[in-house]
Every structure is written in structure tokens, then in C-alpha cells.
Amino acid sequence: MARTKQTARKTVGGDINSRISEKRAKSDNSKNIDLKKVHRYKPGTVALREIRKYQKSTNLLIRKLPFQRLVRELAQDYKSDLRFQNSAVLALQEASESYLVNLFEDTNLCAIHAKRVTIMPKDIYLARRIRGEMIF
């Protein structure tokens, strides 16, 4: 029998799981196979779990090497060939993470005050303005 070329066909819409189950039902060798349903948590459950996890820990949230590269890149603007002790970079990282966490706490309070649960740039601007920081 001669081989023939097959042309590409578009699939007709519909749920992929229903099409798979129909194919399995038609085939002879897979009579009693059930598709396992993917487990999903309710929206917000994983977020709350992450919040609890990070509130318990005292670890740094930003990775050390990317932060170190950022510090060196910013220092190049002021003076070239600057060298940093490891403890100096660690102190900068501790201070910057503390600042960011406090800023996000204040930002979250601003969003809650506006009867929202999602923070927006205007919340950050308001938090910084209340703190008395300069906004560029």
C-alpha cells in the first residue's frame, strides 16, 4: 500500500478533558481508567499560607548574589573600583528589605482604607507622602 501525505487539520473546540475521555471510552484496551482531577486550593488559601510562612521566618527575601550585583552596579555611578565587605552588603540588604517590608505594610493599610484588597501605585505614593519622603 502506498504511503500518502497527511494534511494538518484544525481541532474543533470543546473541552480537552471531555475529548480525551471520549477517546478512552471508545478504545478497547482502556475500559476502566478514570481521569484524576487536578487538586486546586480555593483562591487566597495559598496566599495566606505564604503570608504566614514569611511572617514566621527571619530569612532574607531577596537573593544575595542578585542584590550584590545591584549594589555594585549602583556604586559604579559614583566611583569605579569600589570594593565591598561581605558584611557591608549584608547590612545594606537587611536595611533595604526592612524598608521595603515597612513600605508595603503602610501601602496595604492605604489600600484597606480605600476599601480595596489590591495595592496600587497610588497607595505607595500616599504612604510615601504621609511618611514625608521625597517622591520623584
Curated annotation (Swiss-Prot):
The keyword Membrane does not apply. Belongs to the histone H3 family. Signal peptide: none annotated. It is found in: Nucleomorph; Chromosome. GO terms for molecular function: DNA binding; protein heterodimerization activity; structural constituent of chromatin. Core component of nucleosome. Nucleosomes wrap and compact DNA into chromatin, limiting DNA accessibility to the cellular machineries which require DNA as a template. Histones thereby play a central role in transcription regulation, DNA repair, DNA replication and chromosomal stability. DNA accessibility is regulated via a complex set of post-translational modifications of histones, also called histone code, and nucleosome remodeling. Pfam families: Histone. One of its GO terms (cellular component) is nucleosome. InterPro entries: Histone-fold, Histone_H2A/H2B/H3, Histone_H3/CENP-A. The nucleosome is a histone octamer containing two molecules each of H2A, H2B, H3 and H4 assembled in one H3-H4 heterotetramer and two H2A-H2B heterodimers. The octamer wraps approximately 147 bp of DNA. Keywords: Chromosome, DNA-binding, Nucleomorph, Nucleosome core. CDD domains: HFD_H3 (cd22911). This is Histone H3. Its main location: other.
